[in-house]
């Protein structure tokens, strides 16, 4: 069974943003992914071919345009 759970990292601890559906003492495997867009785009840089140079700043601008039009 897999579930994606949003957390916030504070004072060295991952704190879930909602109540967890697990039993006390249950062992889990955790995969951590950052929601930092700039960091994610930097990691993906070069893996997508667009035929022209596009900066990370422009990609973030386009994302804002798309979401603001919905």
UniProtKB/Swiss-Prot annotation:
Keywords: Toxin-antitoxin system
Protein name according to UniProt: Putative antitoxin PYRAB08720
Function as written in the Swiss-Prot or TrEMBL entry: Possibly the antitoxin component of a type II toxin-antitoxin (TA) system.
Top-level lineage group: Archaea
Keyword Ribosomal protein: no
Family per similarity comment: Belongs to the UPF0165 family.
């Amino acid at each position: 069974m897999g579930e994606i759970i949003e957390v916030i990292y504070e004072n060295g601890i991952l704190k879930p943003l909602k109540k967890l559906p697990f039993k006390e003492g249950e062992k889990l495997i955790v995969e951590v992914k950052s929601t930092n867009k700039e960091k994610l785009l930097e990691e993906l840089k070069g893996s997508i071919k667009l035929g022209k140079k596009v900066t990370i700043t422009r990609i973030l601008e386009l994302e804002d345009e798309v979401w603001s039009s919905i």
